[in-house]
Amino acid sequence: MNPKKSIQLWELQSLLKGATYKKLIEKKTYEAGKERADNYDFLFMSFISFIVSCRLFILVFTFIFKGFPSAIQVIAMIDAVVNALLILIVLAMLFIGSRKLTVEIRRGEVEDFQENLKAREDTFNSSPYQRY
């Protein structure tokens, strides 16, 4: 078997039965969700830094050109553009967060998971502290 090749859902269901199937799916879903959450933190921090830098630029620009009436119009226009960009970024972040989570399981992972579960069960069954 090729461990690099993805496995189809019906093959996975035929290889693993009942609780074992559910455990593997839960494990892989958790890993995929954790990976997405790590990327989401970076996007969130980039978003916050963009907001702060744009607002500071507008504040400095306001103090420098306070006496010129045309400068107020420029500041208002810059503020409107920044607000539009922020709305687009928020929509992009919501889209990224709402995408369907893709879980990919490889053949080698299924075999390793079965072996690990079997080893754990054997260890538990041979334990002197086993409950009756």
From Swiss-Prot:
Q: Which GO terms describe its cellular component?
A: cytoplasm; membrane
- Transmembrane feature ranges: 44-64, 75-95
* Cell compartment(s), UniProt: Cytoplasm; Membrane
- The primary location reported for this protein is cytoplasm
User: What does the UniProt keyword field contain?
Assistant: Cytoplasm, Membrane, Transmembrane, Transmembrane helix
What top-level branch of life does the organism fall under? Eukaryota
Instruction: List the membrane topology term(s).
Output: Multi-pass membrane protein
Q: What is this protein called?
A: Putative uncharacterized membrane protein C622.03c
